[in-house]
Amino acid sequence: MSEPLKPRIDFAEPLKEESTSTFKAQQTFSEVESRTFSPAAIDEYPEDEGTAEAAVDAALQPKRSLWRKMVLGGLALFGASVVGQGIQWTMNAWQTQDWAALGGCAAGALIIGAGVGSVITEWRRLWRLRQRAHERDEARELLHSHSVGKGRAYCEKLAQQAGIDQSHPALQRWYAAIHETQNDREIVGLYAHLVQPVLDAQARREVSRFAAESTLMIAVSPLALVDMAFIAWRNLRLINRIAALYGIELGYYSRLRLFRLVLLNIAFAGASELVREVGMDWMSQDLAARLSTRAAQGIGAGLLTARLGIKTMELCRPLPWFDDDKPRLGDFRRQLIGQLKETLQKNKPTPEK
C-alpha cells in the first residue's frame, strides 16, 4: 500500500535572490598619480615561519640586570689592576736587575696572553655560531626576492665556509646551471637543490650511525649509569660532527650554547611533533609485544639521538628547509627497528639438533 502524500508547507518569507558579484567602478589615474603609484605590500612570509626560532632566540637573550653590570665592571677593573701591577713589577725588576722576578713577570705575561687569546678565540667561535642564524635569515630573504646580484656571492660564501672545493661535481653542476638572467631567488634555489644536499646527506649518515649505536648500546647494556654516560658522550660528539660538516667550528662556550639551543628548540617544538611523526605508526606495529623491554628502551634512546641530530642540522644549516628535503623522524625509526631486529636475530642462539 502506497504511503499518503505529505501536506503542503507554505513559507512566510520569500525566496532569497541570488547575490551577484558587483565590480567596482573604473578608476583612472592621472600621469602624476601613476608615477607615484606603489602596489600594496603583500606578506610573503607565513605567520608561523620562524616562530620557534624567534622564541628560542628570545629565551637565550641574557637579561641585563644591575648585578650583571656590577660583576662585569668589577672584572674589568680587576683586569686593569693586574695589568698595571704587572707592568710596575716588570719595571722594578728591570731597574733592580732582579732576573728571577723578571722571569716570573714574563711567565705571568705569557699565561695572561694565552688566556686572552683563548677568550678571543671562544668569542669568535660563539659569534660565528650566532652569525649562522643571520645567514639563514638572509637566505630566507633571498628566496623571496626578485633582485639580482647577491645570490651568487652568498652561495659561494656558503660553499667556502663548508669547505666545498671548486672542482666538486655538485658545485660544478651549479655553476653550469646558473646564468646572468636569473635572479637571486633562482640562484639560491639551485644551490639548495644541487649543492646543499651533499652536506645534508653526510649529516643524515652521521645521525643514522650515532642513533644506531645508541640503540644497540642501550639494548645490550645491563648498566643504566653506563648507558647515560654513553648517550651523553655520543650526543655531544654528534653535535660536533654536524657543526663541523656545516662549516662551524665549536669552542667550549659555543658548544654549550648550541647544545642549549638544540634542547630549547626541541622543548619549543613540543611532544606533538613526535606523536605526529612516530606515535600512530609505533602503536600500529605493536612493538611492545614484539620486542623486549631493553630493546624498546634502545629504540627510544636512538630516536632521541636522531631527534637531537635533526634539530642540530636545522640550527647549523645555512639554508631553511624545503618541504621535501627536511628529514623525518619516522625514516630513522624504520631503520633503527630493522637494524635492531637484525642484531637480535644474529645473537639469538640456534637450537641444537
Swiss-Prot record:
The chain crosses the membrane at residues 70-90, 100-120, 213-233. Residues 1-19 have a biased composition (Basic and acidic residues). Keywords: Cell inner membrane, Cell membrane, Membrane, Transmembrane, Transmembrane helix. Signal peptide: none annotated. Pfam families: DUF697. One of its GO terms (cellular component) is plasma membrane. Residues 20-29 have a biased composition (Polar residues). It is found in: Cell inner membrane. Residues 1-29 are annotated as: Disordered. Its main location: membrane. InterPro entries: DUF697, UPF0283. It is a multi-pass membrane protein. PANTHER family: UPF0283 MEMBRANE PROTEIN YCJF (PTHR39342:SF1). Belongs to the UPF0283 family. This is UPF0283 membrane protein YcjF. It comes from Salmonella arizonae (strain ATCC BAA-731 / CDC346-86 / RSK2980). The gene is ycjF.
